[in-house]
């Protein structure tokens, strides 16, 4: 019967296919789907023990998954599965235990889902990096170079095609494309942020590992339920764990609280395990067994969990140590004794953040090495034992003798030293205090008296060590504080009314540029973009290519640079705020000065010539001696001043075009008197001049650190010489160029007749 039914079904499919040619592929597709689903149903029954409701479980995903999720396919949409909704559940539930053929289908679908291309180079993308889908190579390239002040140069046509092969050949075009597609350099983390993220991930990983251990499986407890108590020793008092308090540099508060708890009757010390998660019941060390104790770790008495990672109390071994030997020490009139140099170094080494000096004078720090003595007894000369704990982990050690859990705690008497003038019954050992072995005797108000004396010791000895110059902690770095507004009094680099009065450089300053300063530098680069674009035609190009250049050719070459300076000025937002008369005054007074500053980057001292990349594929140079020799009689004095001006700039500045751009903008935005500028223009120009000078100072600091002060202090003298050069340059071409031989724009600045 089943066989006949199958034959009839096949015949009906053939008839339907012959009648409807458009549905030729549909029976084949349905037959494949039915076969695949039958195979999956049989395979899941034989090999999988999946609960019936497991099909509804959502797929797990993590935020660190680098896969770029694409929209669901059409086949997975409701109503497009061919049959009923149960078919969809069969496909979903077969992901974990499907056949090899199903794995191939799933892997092919997964590979199609993963096929995303990098927006920069077109390579295989791994995820969203800095706001754009990119590959790992472009992600690393952008992180390394987006915040660098270094200016890349394109070795080709400034318009390179970036793909997976050519991306290595041109860094400038690759970085420009990164910004073009929308990558944001503000999303790059600095070293401090990377360190915090790494620590956070390590903490999360450690927490997950502890929770995943078999011993950590505990039954859930309500908020008001008490932790599990061992039935072996019901008389042992177990206290719930307390939240850890932040560590402070003064340990007296922790000492006082712990000592006050020690004087309470019927109180047992809290027994806890080392810091971290506590997956084991808290019981007495005597009655705990292997099943309820952590492996290879013994329960110890620790105050608030502030102990060494090894999980032992250093003071336990201190009680077994032999009594310390005493040596004679030099005494002071105030009843103090002087610590030895080695002991003083050890004391400083226990202060968080303190630096032990390598060489120490025996007489200079005598007031710091002085400590109180008890009735003339000298201080112990023992060095720090191997079991001593750091000063930040000091705790009061006690010997408790309890028979039934109801007797009071009896504290053993130990050798101690007291401040002169106080009773010898209530005292503490200063030397032991420095080694983390503080013991106390007495009761009642003894704790308060001891607390006062400990504070006095802290003020007299430890605080003086902290206040010493070699132990001062560095001040907060202002440059690392994020700022919201640019050019405000709270900004990273200060807006100075007189930028030439540079304050003395402070030590331990982070000279890294912040986001606002980097944005301002990007605006400067954008304004000068295209300054070195190659020429292709025109009379100026013929002047560039001549081997023997005339004064008219020199003016035509300067015409190209002058026109590009005008384009740069129009690209500066502050220049557009100036009135039309003010713009003319700025360009007329600053054009020759900007040409001279431009010569700083083009002058080659080895060949004594100016070199320019304006002509593509041509090495164009103009010899300085030949150029000034063809001008009038005043040219030689002008040449000497120009060479002197070039000498004010270091070689690092001459090679850094961005620094020279900032100098050129500061020269452009200078108050001019021909023609006179109105009051509003003077205000705008003055603010912009100070702005670019302050930005230049910060940029130099980011490159040279403390050496930037020496470089920046030479700029005012260089600008003074620049003004003198510009005043005497107008007559250089007088009588050497005929009318019509040169372009008109240079004739506005240089007189030819």
Curated annotation (Swiss-Prot):
Chief location of this protein within or outside the cell: nucleus
Protein name: Nuclear hormone receptor family member daf-12
Motif (Nuclear localization signal) on chain: 191-206
Effect of residue 196 to K: Small reduction in DNA binding in vitro
Biased composition (Low complexity): 212-227
Outcome of mutating residue 143 to K: In m116 and m423; no transcriptional activity in vitro. Defective dauer formation
Reported effect, residue 582 to K: In rh193; temperature sensitive mutant
CDD domains: NR_DBD_CAR, NR_LBD_F1
Entry keyword Transcription regulation: yes
InterPro entries from the UniProt entry: NHR-like_dom_sf (IPR035500), Nucl_hrmn_rcpt_lig-bd (IPR000536), Nuclear_hormone_rcpt_NR1 (IPR050234), Znf_hrmn_rcpt (IPR001628), Znf_NHR/GATA (IPR013088)
The protein's assembly and partners: Interacts with din-1 isoform d.
Zinc fingers (NR C4-type), renumbered ranges: 118-138, 154-173
Record organism: Caenorhabditis elegans
Phenotypic consequence of residue 564 to H: In rh273; dauer-constitutive phenotype with gonadal heterochrony
A Pfam family it matches: zf-C4
């Amino acid at each position: 019967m089943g066989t006949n039914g199958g034959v009839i079904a096949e015949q009906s499919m053939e008839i339907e296919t012959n009648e409807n040619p458009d549905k030729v592929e549909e029976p084949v597709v349905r037959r494949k789907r039915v076969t695949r689903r039958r195979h999956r149903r049989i395979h899941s029954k034989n090999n999988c023990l999946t609960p019936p409701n497991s099909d509804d479980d959502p797929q797990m995903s993590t935020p660190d998954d680098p896969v770029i999720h694409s929209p669901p396919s059409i086949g997975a949409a409701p109503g497009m599965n061919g049959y009923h909704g149960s078919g969809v559940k069969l496909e979903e539930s077969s992901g974990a235990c499907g056949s090899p053929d199903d794995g191939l289908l799933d892997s092919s679908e997964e590979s199609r889902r993963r096929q995303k291309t990098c927006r920069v180079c077109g390579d295989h993308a791994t995820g969203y990096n800095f706001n754009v889908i990119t590959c790992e190579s472009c992600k690393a390239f952008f992180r390394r170079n987006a915040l660098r002040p270094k200016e890349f140069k394109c070795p080709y046509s400034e318009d390179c095609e970036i793909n997976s092969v050519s991306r290595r050949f041109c860094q400038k075009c690759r970085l420009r494309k990164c910004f073009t597609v929308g990558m944001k350099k503000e999303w790059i983390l600095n070293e401090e942020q990377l360190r915090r993220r790494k620590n956070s991930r390590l903490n999360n990983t450690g927490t997950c590992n502890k929770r995943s251990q078999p011993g950590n499986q505990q039954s859930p407890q309500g908020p008001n339920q008490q932790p599990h108590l061992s039935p072996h020793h019901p008389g042992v008092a177990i206290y719930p764990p307390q939240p850890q308090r932040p560590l402070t540099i003064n340990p007296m508060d922790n000492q006082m609280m712990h000592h006050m708890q020690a004087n309470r009757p019927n109180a047992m010390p809290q027994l806890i395990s080392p810091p971290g998660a506590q997956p084991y019941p808290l019981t007495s060390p005597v009655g705990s067994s292997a099943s309820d104790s952590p492996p290879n770790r013994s329960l110890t008495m620790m105050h608030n969990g502030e102990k060494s990672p090894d999980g032992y109390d250093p003071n336990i071994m201190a009680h077994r140590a032999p009594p310390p030997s005493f040596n004679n020490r030099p005494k002071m009139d105030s009843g103090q004794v002087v610590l030895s140099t080695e002991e003083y170094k050890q004391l400083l080494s226990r202060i968080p953040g303190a630096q032990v000096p390598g060489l120490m004078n025996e007489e200079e720090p005598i007031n710091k090495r002085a400590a109180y003595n008890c009735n003339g007894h000298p201080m112990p000369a023992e060095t720090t034992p191997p079991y001593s704990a750091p000063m930040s982990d000091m705790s009061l050690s006690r010997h408790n003798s309890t028979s039934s859990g109801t007797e009071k705690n009896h504290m053993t008497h130990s050798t101690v030293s007291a401040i002169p003038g106080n009773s010898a019954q209530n005292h503490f050992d200063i030397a032991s205090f420095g080694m983390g072995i503080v013991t106390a005797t007495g009761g009642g108000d003894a704790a308060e008296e001891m607390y006062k004396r400990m504070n006095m010791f802290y003020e007299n000895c430890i605080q003086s060590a902290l206040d010493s110059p070699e132990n001062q902690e560095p001040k907060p770095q202002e440059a690392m504080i994020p700022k919201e507004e640019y050019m405000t009094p709270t900004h990273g680099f200060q807006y100075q009314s007189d930028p030439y009065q540079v304050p003395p450089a402070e030590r331990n300053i982070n000279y890294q540029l912040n986001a606002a300063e980097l944005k301002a530098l990007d605006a400067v680069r954008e304004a000068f973009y295209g300054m070195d674009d190659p020429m292709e035609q025109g009379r100026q190009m013929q002047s560039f290519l001549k081997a023997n250049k005339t004064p008219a050719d020199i003016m035509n070459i300067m015409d190209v640079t002058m026109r590009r300076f005008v384009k740069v000025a129009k690209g500066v937002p502050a220049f557009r705020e100036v009135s039309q008369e003010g713009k003319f005054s700025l360009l007329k007074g600053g054009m020759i000065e900007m040409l001279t500053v431009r010569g700083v980057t083009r002058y080659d001292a080895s060949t004594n010539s100016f070199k320019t990349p304006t002509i593509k594929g041509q090495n164009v140079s103009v010899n300085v001696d030949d150029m000034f020799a063809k001008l009038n009689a005043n040219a030689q004095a002008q040449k000497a001043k120009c060479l002197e001006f070039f000498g004010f700039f270091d070689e690092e500045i001459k090679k850094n075009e961005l620094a020279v751009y900032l100098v050129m903008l500061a020269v452009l935005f200078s108050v001019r008197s021909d023609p006179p500028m109105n009051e509003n223009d003077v205000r705008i120009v003055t603010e912009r001049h100070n702005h670019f000078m302050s930005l230049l100072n910060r940029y130099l600091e980011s490159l040279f650190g403390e050496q930037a002060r020496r470089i920046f202090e030479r700029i005012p003298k260089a600008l003074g010489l620049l003004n003198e050069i510009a005043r005497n340059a107008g007559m250089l071409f007088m009588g050497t160029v005929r009318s019509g031989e040169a372009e008109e724009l240079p004739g506005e600045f240089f007189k030819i007749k």
